[in-house]
């Protein structure tokens, strides 16, 4: 019987360590679940991408160019994780949805970066989840889940165990859609999740938290889809 596919958008913070320890932990986690799942990972750009984008923006680069810089960094991060996984991983990051679809047919762990300018890696991950028929989409971020307000600005912010897709869409509509500015999710991702009814969680990018989510234990914030 074919393994179920799970798409994990992995925050760029996983790739910023100096000694590679965190990266190896993620590689061990992905290798460990690959007996029962086929993981497809989308690497974020993280701090390095934001720094490069800020530098290029100060030099007058347009938004499309800034997006392309972010995509380039995310694909380098993907290559780092591929190196850590070795023979368990597809040997290079797919550059298009069609390439992703062909890559998963090989049965290995597939690691991608960004694909298209104007689209966050969250949107990319949702499109990939749709394309490969993923049973689950885990959006692993720098926070524990979705809060009722910005936890970085409000110490009394409350994390939500569940949030309706419509409510999250309203929250995101207030955010800027500029290169390097996406955090929890983007509107493209929500549209894809809704139309294909993809089971989705937003949670912290932490190996132990991801293990809980894969086992079916409550972790982070569950995205509640509207009735069909």
UniProtKB/Swiss-Prot annotation:
Gene3D superfamilies: Acetylglutamate kinase-like. It holds the Pfam family AA_kinase. One of its GO terms (molecular function) is ATP binding. The keyword tRNA processing does not apply. SUPFAM superfamilies: Carbamate kinase-like (SSF53633). Pathway: Pyrimidine metabolism; CTP biosynthesis via de novo pathway; UDP from UMP (UMPK route): step 1/1. Coiled coil: none annotated. UMP binds at residues 45, 67, 115-121. One of its GO terms (biological process) is UDP biosynthetic process. Homohexamer. This is Uridylate kinase. It comes from Cenarchaeum symbiosum (strain A).
């Amino acid at each position: 019987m074919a393994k179920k596919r799970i798409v994990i958008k992995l925050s760029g913070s996983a790739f910023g360590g100096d000694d590679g320890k965190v990266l190896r932990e993620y590689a061990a986690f992905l290798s460990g679940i690959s007996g029962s799942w086929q993981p497809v990972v989308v690497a974020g750009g993280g701090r390095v991408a934001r720094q490069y984008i800020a530098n290029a923006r100060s030099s007058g680069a347009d938004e499309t160019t800034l997006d392309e810089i972010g995509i380039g960094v995310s694909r380098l991060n993907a290559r780092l994780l591929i190196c850590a996984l070795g023979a368990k991983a597809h040997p290079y990051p797919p550059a298009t949805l069609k390439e992703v679809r062909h890559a998963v047919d090989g049965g290995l762990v597939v690691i991608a970066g960004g694909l298209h300018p104007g689209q966050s890696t969250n949107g990319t991950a949702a499109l990939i989840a749709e394309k490969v028929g993923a049973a689950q989409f885990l959006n692993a971020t720098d926070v524990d889940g979705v809060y009722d307000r910005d936890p970085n600005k409000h110490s009394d912010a409350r994390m939500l165990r569940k949030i309706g897709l419509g409510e999250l869409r309203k929250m995101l509509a207030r955010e800027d859609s500029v290169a390097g500015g996406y955090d929890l999710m983007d509107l493209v991702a929500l549209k894809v999740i809704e139309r294909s009814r993809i089971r989705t969680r937003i949670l912290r990018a932490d190996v132990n938290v991801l293990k809980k989510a894969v086992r079916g234990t409550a972790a982070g914030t569950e995205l509640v889809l509207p009735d069909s």
